[in-house]
Amino acid sequence: MKYGSVCEKGKRPQNQDGMLVRMDSRYMPLAAVSDGMGGHLAGDAASALSLQILDENTRCMNIAPQDMLARAYVLANDAVLEESHRDPYKDGMGATLVSALFFPDHFIAANVGDSRLYSFKQGVLRQVTYDHSYVQELVRLGYITKEQAKHHPKRNLITRCIGSSDGPFETDLFYIDWKQGDSVLLCSDGLSGVLEEEDIQDILSQPYSPQIQCEKLAALALKKGSTDNITALIVCNDEEDTCS
């Protein structure tokens, strides 16, 4: 597998996004993106802790991968919640967390929040994850359109996050087949919130390396007016330098 990544603060004074790529042959390959929230001190701490707990708890080879991934999310939620209670400066902190464990012919994805995972197969982009957000619920119920959601005053309000104490914690899990030449994009809403799917598909269709694809996506997001941190992480099921 090949991968590339960009994680930058964009037009924000501080970067509260985080990302993780684990390609250690001793463990299952893992990729993840987390977008922290909770103020100057807390946002980056929430995303960093979420990724740390995810990494530490997805290394066991004796547990069904989907169960291990779901358990890691619960532990990450507990850890972020505990830290927010321990440190008054981090009160109310939280984070999104989207991730994927990779296997030769499939991957298992998990998501909480509005960071996204897209699959790209044979020139076609598909959003795999479902945004846990207020506006996505309005779209699902038919109250607003996808286009209206982009400009809604509550478009940044998420309904699930790592660090939540509201009711039973739930993680969305997805089992997706993938073949040689397929790729996966994990990103924060600093990217997906401003780029159309056609924009992303066009760049992933070009014969660039995953790193160049990520850089082009981030540059286009800035050009289109992103005011948030921007993270793009592409994993390609290919041994070649390019992926398309």
Give the positions of each predicted feature.
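PP2C/PPM-type serine/threonine phosphatase catalytic domain
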Residues: 1-244
